[in-house]
């Protein structure tokens, strides 16, 4: 199963490193990543593969919300199909 992880917040050093390490600990594979800095704001979208993950999507989503609070970012995870349905015209 694939999911989309989005991250938004004030830019600071180590955001990608922290999130990548967090995902690696749970055996979540990063398939694609796009990130940009808009003025002083960091934005990132990751496409991740959960087929070998050590956690379920619902647990990962809750853990990412908590991690986001800890690092001052908004982090959300959605099933890829739900993300696509919500963002199609």
Protein language model regions, located:
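A conserved regulatory-domain signal marking ACT and ACT-like small-molecule sensing domains
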Residues: 1-89
């Amino acid at each position: 199963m694939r999911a989309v992880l989005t991250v938004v917040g004030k830019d600071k050093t180590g955001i990608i490193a922290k999130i990548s390490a967090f995902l690696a600990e749970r055996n979540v594979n990063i398939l694609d990543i796009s990130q940009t800095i808009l003025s002083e704001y960091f934005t990132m979208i990751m496409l991740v593969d959960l087929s070998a993950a050590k956690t379920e999507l619902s647990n990962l989503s809750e853990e990412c919300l908590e991690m986001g609070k800890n690092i001052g970012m908004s982090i959300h995870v959605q099933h890829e199909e739900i993300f696509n349905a919500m963002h199609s015209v």
